[in-house]
């Protein structure tokens, strides 16, 4: 999808998709399309996860043991694979949130430095 200069949507920072998926699944099991919709809704439509990024990430998280998947029926009465957090996925989410907080603080110190005598 081509973006225009006035498009308010934001690009996901590299490495944040896994964290967003894990956080979204803290609210409960969800199918892939629902995870993408939840990220979009919770970000006030600023973040959109493309299918080509979402499903490889889900498979990677299952392979790492952070998610479990099982087939079920969606709200549209369609067969869908539902994902849920595992205990190790919850632990990973805590680690990811801690790293994210550190990153935000570090960037904040650069973007909003304390005034110095030189300024």
PLM region spans:
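Amphipathic alpha-helical dimerization/coiled-coil segments
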Residues: 88-119
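Short, Lys/Arg-enriched N-terminal segment that forms or immediately precedes the first helix
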Residues: 1-10
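Beta-hairpin "wing" of winged helix-turn-helix
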Residues: 62-78, 84
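Residue-level detection of the helix-turn-helix DNA-binding "recognition helix"
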Residues: 40, 59, 63
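Short, well-ordered turn and helix-capping elements at secondary-structure junctions
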Residues: 39, 43, 71-73, 87-89
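Short, structured helix-loop boundary elements
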Residues: 10, 51, 79-82, 97, ...
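N-terminal helix-turn-helix DNA-binding core of bacterial DNA-binding proteins
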Residues: 9-55
